[in-house]
Amino acid sequence: MSEIMKIDTVRQYNDYFGVETLHLSVSVIEGCKAKPLRYCRKLYNLYAILLKDTDCGQLKYGQSCYDYRQGTMLFLAPGQIMGSEDDGRLHQPEGWVLAFHPEFLQKTPLARLIKEYSYFSYNANEALHLSEQERKIVLECMEKIRTELQHPIDKHSKSLITDNIKLLLDYCIRFYDLQFITRENVNHDILTRFELSLIHISEPTRRS
C-alpha cells in the first residue's frame, strides 16, 4: 500500500495540483487547469468538496469504496482519508474542487453550522449523484466563490465567501434529500411489483 499524503494547508493543496494560490484559506480548483498527477491516498486536514466530470472508478473513502462516476460529489472533513492507489501513471484531473481550511470559518455562523451537514461524515456512506441541472447549480456556486477569491480582499470578503460556501452546502443537502426520496420511491415500486407477482403466482394455487 502506498504512503498517505498529508494535506494540511490550502497552499499545499494548490501546489499539489500545480495551480496558483489566490487565498490562503480557500481554493476553487478546475481540474482541467491542473497538472497531470499520479493517484495517491490523501489525509485531508481541510474541508474539501469534489465534483467529478469523468468516471474515476472506485475510490477508497475511509473503510469504504465508492463508485466515483461522472457527475458525482464527495465531501471530506478534516481528518478523513480518500484517494486511489498509485497505478504508476499520470492522470489529468477532471472536475472541480472547493477546499477551505477549518480556521477560516472561525467567528462566522458557518463554524457552528458545519457539523449539521451530515454528508461530511464517513457515516453518510454514499456519494451524491447529480442531475445535469443540479450540476449546473453546483458549478454556479463554485464560480461565485472563485470570482470572490479573485477580488481584492476587503472587509466584505470573508462573509461573502462563507455565505456562498453555505449556499453550496444547502443546495447539496437538498440534492441528497431528493436522491434518497427518489430511491425510496423506486424501491417501493419494485416491492409493490414483487408483491403483485407473488399474488399472481399464488392465485392459481388457491383456485386448484
What does each model-found stretch correspond to?
Residues 54, 78-80, 100-102:
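Residues immediately flanking
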Residues 87-150:
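A hydrophobic/aromatic-rich effector-binding and dimerization subdomain
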Residues 1-67:
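Generic protein-terminus/edge-of-domain signal
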Residues 133-185, 189-195:
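An amphipathic alpha-helical interaction segment
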Residues 74, 79-85, 105-106:
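Histidine-centered metal-chelating micro-motifs
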Residues 58-60, 82-90:
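Short beta-strand His + acidic residue motifs that chelate non-heme Fe in jelly-roll/DSBH
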Residues 200-208:
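Single conserved hydrophobic/aromatic residue that forms the stacking wall/gate
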